[in-house]
């Protein structure tokens, strides 16, 4: 099983490993570092590559070093090409984004300005359209890195996918769903 090395990616891979072993299969986790993991000083939109989190996984699938790759569906390209297919999906978490912060007083509807970190082009566009009083900053890195940056005051809050926040146990930081 090929996967990225973040805590969230490993959580997902170990979850699949348990399911496979329960069905009688043997499995081994192989950690693969991707371009998206290595280049942290630029916005994803500036890296200029499709599959920034999947390309290295795909290479190892093609050359037989791994048999399957476990990955978040949100990072997959919409067209996988002829060489790959999605063979399974796990039960889906809630699909919404959540705002997380240590400051429970923040309110996006208050009209008061504050700084939100995210790396998603979709989330940035949504925030700018619906909450123009907020400042949005690019915030790259895995979930733990983003939480650390929040704690270091790089931003006041983070806009993240509920699934990752839930799986990594950061429920107490959710201030808006």
Tell where the protein language model's regions lie, with residue ranges:
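Domain-level signature for soluble enzymes in the chorismate/prephenate branch of the shikimate pathway
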Residues: 1-177
